[in-house]
Amino acid sequence: MITCSMITNIILTSQQHNCLVSLAKDSLPNESCALLVGNHNGKETFVLDLIPMKNSDASIISFSIAPQELIDAYQTVEKQGMEVVGIFHSHPAQPLPSSVDKKFMQINPVVWIIYSTITNEAKAYIFEEKIEEVQLRVTTA
């Protein structure tokens, strides 16, 4: 397993990016969330599939995923021979990790993509000893 400190890029297709933006906008005024499924190749993380998840908080300022829904998703991903490489969620503010995000980033050491429904900008982050920005690349393929 690759550690977060080795990851410098996360790569999405434009179609995947558009799906995440649509998920965020369709979930308004609440935050949205999804799991990013894929694999790693050296310092790059490739997203191959998206699993939209229900925000069980149904909140405009937070998200959570029901434990059983999360377990089911991880089992499905594992059966496909892939792994959860990231977590996506939207913010009603700047695309920056909140203090709550920081806490959960420590527990879930994957890339976190945060999309701002205000600025329509997405940024990616990892947490090791501190939060670091990861380059988010959107490809046309």
Q: Where in the sequence are the language-model features?
A:
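Conserved beta-strand-loop surface patch within small alpha/beta domains used
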Residues: 2-84, 92-141
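Conserved, mostly hydrophobic/aromatic
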Residues: 87
